[in-house]
Amino acid sequence: MNNWTWNISWFSDPVFLGHYPKEGLEKFKEYLPEITEADMQLIHQPLDFMGQNIYNGYYVRQGADGEPEFVDREPGFPKTACNWPVTPKAFYYGIKFLTERYPLPLYITENGMSCHDNVSFDGRVHDNDRITFLDSYIGAMQRAYDEGADIRGYFLWTFLDNFEWSEGYRERFGMIYVDFMTQRRIVKDSAFWYQDVIGTNGGNLSMNQTTKEILFLDPVCTHNIWGGTRLREDFHYLVEGDDLGECWGISAHPNGDGTLRDCGFRGMKLSEL
């Protein structure tokens, strides 16, 4: 397709903006019925907010023929138990796209992770992967909010392990473990963690912890291991005037005693750490 943005906007533009995206009208013009002004008046009604489910996304690039194409993920890319990629960046950019395109408050109506949850010998369910997932996704949502996105609410999928569409009881998305044979419930570690997220209004998220340890890496290792921008985009360690985003330490940093921004040590110089 010439423009994949209307994957969502084909359905949302008529409702929120009062017209269909031009890309879709052009591509499907020979198949579409006549769309009248009366149709659009009926479709485009006043609404108070937009609700959107966001779970993951995929990398796309321009192919040799100028058309968009999917980019294969490297081996070992993190995935959920149902084989969905873990992509908090897609959550961030999805929120930004929606709130910039549609001038209404946004609610995330679904987001969560299926894990291989098991009851441990201590009788508890230690779903650390889910905590890591939620920490990164909710942190991405806060980042979008801090940058001006009008996001009003977030609904985690889900409270209890349940019947998940065509996958039945195989996928466990809940914060509370359900033994489907006995109906016994066990509160998972993620539920206690999420309770703290609510109680502290996100204060326990890793992005809000001032005790986060600064990463001092050799410049060569930074590029070879982490990649040119991963420290900036994933860990938010930025130094003023550093377009790479790497924080290597005073001796290695090209800007010398730089000032940190967008992390728990915001405003401090490297020499003050």
Q: For each predicted feature, which ranges?
A:
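Active-site region of glycoside hydrolase catalytic domains
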Residues: 1-211
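N-terminal subdomain of nucleotide-sugar transferases
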Residues: 212-259, 263-268
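Phosphate-bearing ligand-interacting subdomains
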Residues: 271-273
